[in-house]
Amino acid sequence: MTLYGHILAQKYMAGKIVTNDGDTVACMIKVGKWDTNPNRIVTERNNDTKKYWPTEIASFHVDNRTFVSARVKLEVSNHLDGTLDLEDSRPKFANDSIFAELIVGGKKNLYRYKSPSYKEHFLISDQGASLESLVYKRFHVWAKVSGNEVKRELHLEEYKNQLEKYFAGCPGFDGKIAVTGYELGQLRSLFSLYSGCPN
């Protein structure tokens, strides 16, 4: 994208921020294309422009989207084709302060965070609780196929164990979790089903 196109892709829209003290402040928020989650936001109020990092506000809402600030532990292994770890299924973690987008809200909340490297993370929380990152990793192993050694892709799906604990007490959910992939549509569908759970 050219600089001119980048400027055109950004505009101010009416929104609000929630401060770390719990106050809600109406303001204009600069909205870009946001292929990845923003690592900071720019606001304007009464001709006063301010920039906020995740540690400086609790959340913000703009363009029918809500982002919450969180300090989380993310799985940061290489995720692009051609860069996957070989013979190493162990997750690698790093702490980061992020703006996570709320995808499904209620008693059980689902969030998404797409990093600057375009790695997609999903996070969960109960109402009022801290966010927890769902753990998933793609990796390669050597496998014999027709007598030849080839690389085969496997997946560490710890997130399914996390979700079984998270939805404990909801009848029939274990079977649904077992077939839920680590992708936005399937996870959103799973969380939407929870609204029908008697617990």
Name the predicted role of every residue range.
Residues 8-199:
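Compositionally biased alpha-helical segments
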